[in-house]
């Protein structure tokens, strides 16, 4: 597969992880960022119009005025990392009811928005913040048990004969324009996917 892109080897710029992607965006009100999220409870968030400019489910992938979405995991709840997220610049936290109770004990001043499903909410929030980039792109997905990665490389090679430089998001790497980004996970979280799509829109 490496041979398919050998001709671009000297011009590609390698980025470490998808979480390093920072597409161009503008701050929007929190209420707009959460538009379309199901089961919202604003009772612990006194200011629905505070502005946010990014979102992440990881406390180590947070910048100033971003939303931290704390997701319950199999072993521990993401709210455990609230302090780290706030220190990094998180302006509010989105989590479930269990997470909200723990968050109030850890940091009673942080605005908290309670949702039924934080992971699903993160997808809607990211799409809102990054202005629904998929709507401006032609996208295709490859599913199956075996051969998905090989198929995506072959398809990208074929599509390059018609389109300028199709982006690729897979389990091995992500390619957007002249950027090559290592895939940290088999399946990226929704905010990362939306950032990848937003970057692809910028590169068009």
Predicted regions and their residues:
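N-terminal leader/targeting and accessory segments in enzymes
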Residues: 2-124
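Phosphate-binding loop of NTP-binding sites
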Residues: 37, 121-204
